[in-house]
């Protein structure tokens, strides 16, 4: 199946990439068959579910799974992988002090909270070197709420990612279980967010969600000013996550126009 997809992409002269990651606490026992895992034990209201903090001895095997995912992606014909280390999924749950309350060497200081990410990147980069696969990392510029990762700390994480010689960092932001609108912006899609929830939770979200979920007003290119700070701090290629302008036609326009002269943008695709 996937080989057919990548084959068709290659036939048209393009390269194919796929995102790899683990959702951590953004799962549910009905989906994964067991209590979801995370950096620390707790409760995720978004799912909703109780989650189990991973044991120290489980972490190396989880990191190796990221490496195996690179091999599987290559076997399926993909030229690149994007390691998801943002948006409040598993690697992000280790990085963020909001979800990482560990007392061992994987929690506490930023250096400790980056330890699991480093383990995963080591496995990914070894697999990438063996298979000739390019590697991108999706990274949070900020979590979007008090008590989460802010830009200064995030830049330090990005510098650590850069040290692993990845091909580029995809800059994004937001934490799905706490500040989902930091990613999407604008009106909160309450009915869509609660569609698959149990009846009791659906009612709770629809009545209380607008008061509990932080709003982030929409503005065009809303990540751009923060992304510039990362451009100043890093040397590797950065991919800016954008959205259509209000006209809804920016992607068509830029694909047929030369990139604007800019000190931080090399090209638009």
Predicted regions and their residues:
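Flavin-dependent oxidoreductase catalytic cores
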Residues: 1-269
